[in-house]
């Protein structure tokens, strides 16, 4: 187990690496700030300063969240920790399946340990009871409930829905495990078979109530949720997986319908022109597993960029928004920024700076072309998970947040979920605590915020998760059916790079 306090290690080499990284970051940052509206002019290929010791430490701590908390008979990952509500997030399980292999490649656990934990996970989901009954089931028609009881693995409560997007995040981890564990070994062969069965069972057309769009979910008490996934957001992964299905695929017209309203979200915000979605998780989740560099669908071909560059611009725009700080929140600046879905202090309207301001507990927060909700709450995952897109602004931000707030926000499993320097009111809180001179700080780590941290650091280092998923035939098929062309899709499946035993 790693220590609870991060300390920079002395030595000429570490100082030299850190100095080089900082120098490069400053040069690239200056170039970034000179970018004309609608462009981020620094070539992405140049933006690769080496990881500093903090990122190495953060990657391991965040991996440990998944490894430590899933050590149970069904290997389910809790939605959050140490909050004592006993439920698992199926999306967090998908991130966990990805994190275990990262732990192998980094030398923190053995391949056998990761294989066995992954096999336990897949055995559970392959055999978990499904059906329309309101209790005692883990899902229906191949989809799974958003939250499951940690012990029984069945639906957590009557308000929990069968979720298309959370099932997709779980499946991304399942397919990652299927592709990573590729050896001639009985246990690894079983992982591949179980992954196929879990993915093939999902009846995607069942949730196409208003075809060709895919609905958000279903509840046994009230039926289908009256909302569909359309326009740019985190559900890009849902459509790619549904198009790639070998058993229950959706039609090609679904991607056309999904992108039909993109123009409403396209525009300029904070000196960047891009396809907007306020919270940064919408620009990150699908990118955890899919390498969008150099591949484009029809819409992005017409716009002249790819989704990776789009996420880069969204990241830069969020930082620019924090520098502008139109709502005058405390702490915001060039190296303290990041709005996404996260915990917050509480749900209330309170006086701040002579104005009534809305604060929220857990909520999506963001700033973009069409939507802004900002209550002063910063989530470190928002910046860290954008590391591959814009390292020249992410690295200084992560270093500054850890340096400025230290152990109050950085602990056993890395960054606590969020903090709000502006919220220092003396009142009862649902979660978190008030720290003098700092403000509100979350008390929990949240699985779906931890997952992008560990995965995107790995992708930044050497493209590990992306390289594995490039070899998955279902991902490739889904992208091709969505009309993606170019880049690695034109190269054909690549052989696997060397791996640890």
Language model segments and positions:
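N-terminal secretory signal peptides that target proteins for export/translocation
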Residues: 1-13
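Composition-driven detection of intrinsically disordered, low-complexity segments
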Residues: 13-14, 225
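Sec-dependent N-terminal signal peptides
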Residues: 14-24
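C-terminal motif of bacterial Sec signal peptides marking the signal peptidase cleavage site
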Residues: 28-31
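Bacterial signal peptide processing site
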Residues: 33-35
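Ser/Thr/Asn(+Pro)-rich, low-complexity disordered segments
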Residues: 41-501
């Amino acid at each position: 187990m790693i220590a609870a306090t991060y300390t920079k290690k002395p030595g000429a080499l570490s100082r030299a690496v850190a100095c080089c990284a900082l120098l490069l970051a400053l040069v690239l940052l200056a170039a970034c700030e000179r970018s004309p509206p609608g462009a981020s002019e620094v070539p992405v290929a140049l933006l690769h300063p080496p990881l500093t010791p903090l990122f190495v430490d953060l990657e391991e701590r965040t991996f440990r969240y998944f490894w430590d908390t899933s050590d149970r008979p069904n290997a389910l990952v809790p939605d959050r920790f140490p909050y004592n509500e006993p439920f698992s997030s199926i999306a967090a399980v998908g991130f966990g399946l990805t994190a275990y292999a990262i732990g192998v490649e980094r030398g923190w656990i053995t391949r056998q340990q990761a294989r066995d934990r992954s096999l336990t996970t897949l055995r559970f989901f392959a055999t978990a009871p499904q059906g329309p009954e309101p209790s005692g089931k883990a899902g229906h028609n191949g989809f799974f409930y958003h939250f499951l009881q940690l012990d029984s693995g069945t639906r957590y409560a009557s308000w929990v829905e069968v979720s298309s997007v959370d099932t997709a995040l779980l499946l991304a981890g399942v397919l990652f495990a299927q592709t990573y564990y590729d050896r001639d070994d009985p246990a690894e062969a079983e992982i591949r078979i179980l992954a196929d069965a879990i993915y093939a069972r999902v009846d995607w057309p069942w949730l196409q109530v208003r075809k060709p769009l895919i609905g958000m979910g279903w509840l046994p008490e009230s039926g289908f949720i009256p909302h569909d996934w359309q326009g740019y957001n985190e559900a890009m992964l849902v459509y790619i997986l549904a198009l790639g299905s070998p058993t229950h695929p959706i039609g090609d017209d679904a991607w056309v319908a999904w992108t039909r309203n993109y123009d409403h979200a396209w525009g300029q915000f904070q000196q960047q022109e891009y396809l907007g979605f306020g919270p940064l998780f919408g620009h990150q989740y699908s990118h955890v597993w899919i390498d969008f560099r150099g591949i484009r669908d029809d819409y992005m071909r017409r716009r002249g960029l790819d989704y990776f560059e789009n996420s880069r611009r969204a990241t830069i725009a969020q930082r620019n928004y924090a520098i502008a700080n139109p709502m005058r929140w405390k702490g915001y600046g060039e190296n303290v920024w990041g709005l996404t879905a996260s915990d917050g202090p509480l749900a209330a309207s309170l006086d701040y700076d002579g104005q009534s301001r809305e604060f929220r507990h857990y909520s999506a927060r963001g700033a973009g072309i069409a939507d802004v909700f900002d209550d002063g709450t910063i989530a470190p995952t928002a910046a860290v998970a954008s590391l591959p897109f814009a390292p020249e602004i992410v690295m200084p931000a992560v270093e500054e947040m850890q340096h400025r707030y230290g152990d109050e926000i950085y602990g056993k499993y890395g960054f606590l979920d969020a903090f709000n320097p502006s919220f220092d009111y003396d009142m009862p809180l649902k979660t978190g605590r008030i720290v003098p001179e700092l403000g509100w700080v979350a008390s929990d780590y949240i699985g779906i915020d931890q997952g992008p941290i560990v995965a995107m650091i790995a992708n930044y280092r050497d493209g590990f998760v992306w390289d594995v998923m490039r070899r998955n035939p279902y991902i490739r098929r889904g992208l091709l059916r969505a009309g993606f062309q170019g880049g690695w899709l034109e190269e054909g499946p690549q052989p696997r790079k060397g791996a640890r035993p």
